């Protein structure tokens, strides 16, 4: 197996180090405990956020007005409205302003994210801005990144293309891995973090036969992190995405070496914030009557400090955002994610995955 990486780079030259404005210092209930600031970082698979226009060279025909999904402007507008509401609610359990950063998957293009942000900002008072780099996926779906323009200041964006070659001659050319570096703000003192957004190869053809693609994706993530460590040995890194594997699967446990318990994590190692929730039977998507937790958030050792300090973010807790409005309330699918479509039938729901999130805290 070989890995081929193509790197796409965009750089913002911005005033990241400016003090927070008075609006940011508004008195809001953003504390984990008295004297602590909290920030939410989330991931959400948006389940086929396609517009109604054909993208040249992409197999998006199913999501056109005359395609299999009969994807009309009305359906698209309802999808955007639903997802904007869901996105606007992420993190509000601990900060009414919502999440600082949100990685997303299954988005057709940057235009869809602009529509999503515009809806969330105008209707729900959010301050979201989007980032997306076009990748080579055949259907045209990409990963992206939304950020609150006050709570997070992006400084650099890299996209890494994955090509996995197999012994039988097969090849996967799929979604970019998107690395967004920037400054997570809090009381005027920013701290740099790196967020890597993923959507790993699917299990099409079976979990075992498709495993090499996800193992290769895990190796690519590890190489991205290693390159960050070369310049920043104490860098703080958040790995997130729809990995199409559970925390105990080979790609996560053995290739990336993301651990179940924080005390097992070595210097520059990784902690899987979702593993123990799956052990308790809590998942992010349901399949054939059982739960999986493919929507994972993995953090590195520098984020695991148990000492709270001013100006330094550290991990507090993880959450699966399985709120009632995102959940089927009756019938045989009761208790599972409320989807946009099922078996080709329009349901006007949200998506087949629950969002996942972590909270970082620091001393005020």
Features from the language model and the residues they span:
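Structured beta-strand-rich core segments of catalytic domains in phosphoester-bond hydrolases
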Residues: 107-194, 200
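Short, solvent-exposed loop/turn elements at domain surfaces
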Residues: 48-55, 204-205, 306-308
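Bacterial Sec-dependent N-terminal signal peptides
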Residues: 1-30
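Second-shell loop/turn segments in exported
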Residues: 29-30, 65-76, 98-106, 132-133, ...
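N-terminal, active-site-proximal structural segment of metallo-dependent hydrolase catalytic domains
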Residues: 24-123, 129-143, 330-334, 361-364
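Extracytoplasmic, non-cytosolic globular domains
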Residues: 132, 178-184, 189-277
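Active-site beta-strand/loop signature of hydrolases that rely on acidic residues for catalysis
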Residues: 41-46, 76-79, 83, 90-113, ...
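Metal-dependent phosphoester-hydrolase catalytic domains
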Residues: 27-33, 172, 227-237, 245-364
